[in-house]
Amino acid sequence: MPFEIVFDGAKDFADLIATASNLIDEAAFKITEEGISMRAMDPSRVVLIDLNLPESIFSKYEVEEEETVGINMDHFKKILKRGKNKDTLILRKGDENFLEITFEGTAKRTFRLPLIEVEELELDLPELPFTAKVVVLGEVLKEAVKDASLVSDALKFIARENEFIMKAEGETNEVEIKLTLEDEGLLDLEVEEETKSAYGISYLADMIKGIGKADEVIIRFGNEMPLQMEYPIRDEGKLIFLLAPRVED
């Protein structure tokens, strides 16, 4: 069998795939001895998605040889949603062109998902000279995006020495969410210089759908530069989005 991978807590894995699937229809997952990785761009080429899951976060990780598997993300998401919190998730691939997805809990349930041909693009995750790093709770980000969507299609991020502001302005109204390190929702703030940039709300909404209210989200950005949003996964794994800025007139 080319690989057998076991992940304790099926729902956590499902949330991860659901978040990525909001932006991409299909993906090529690279399975190596070191772990699982995936890098893709959304169809509009506005968001880069980078997933890295080292073998150490899995309770069992057996890979015979490096392999790339193409997966329909919507079908994968729908199957994974059938997993319960306490279920163990088992991913297997034999010689046939199927991914076997098994949930072990009160019963053993197995799905077989046909693999597909996916074009592998050479995509680099650029190292950008960000001037602000912000760590917030998922709840803060989710509420800010919901608030901003009422008044505009863009959300401006502003980082200063002692505060982080998210602001949206419409033709007749506006909303501002302000955080300092005294607020529970802002966990860390590092600012080299006052930094401002705006981003499309529809993309932000897709990027944060799968995160929990108590999850930590690491945001890095620069003046009119892409926004890098990172979700740590069980300490060693991570899901990163790189979102192009909304250029203001």
From Swiss-Prot:
Pfam families: PCNA_C (PF02747), PCNA_N (PF00705). The keyword ATP-binding does not apply. One of its GO terms (biological process) is regulation of DNA replication. Signal peptide: none annotated. Keywords: DNA replication, DNA-binding. GO terms for molecular function: DNA binding; DNA polymerase processivity factor activity. Gene3D superfamilies: 3.70.10.10. Sliding clamp subunit that acts as a moving platform for DNA processing. Responsible for tethering the catalytic subunit of DNA polymerase and other proteins to DNA during high-speed replication. HAMAP family: DNApol_clamp_arch (MF_00317). Homotrimer. The subunits circularize to form a toroid; DNA passes through its center. Replication factor C (RFC) is required to load the toroid on the DNA. Belongs to the PCNA family. This is DNA polymerase sliding clamp. The gene is pcn.
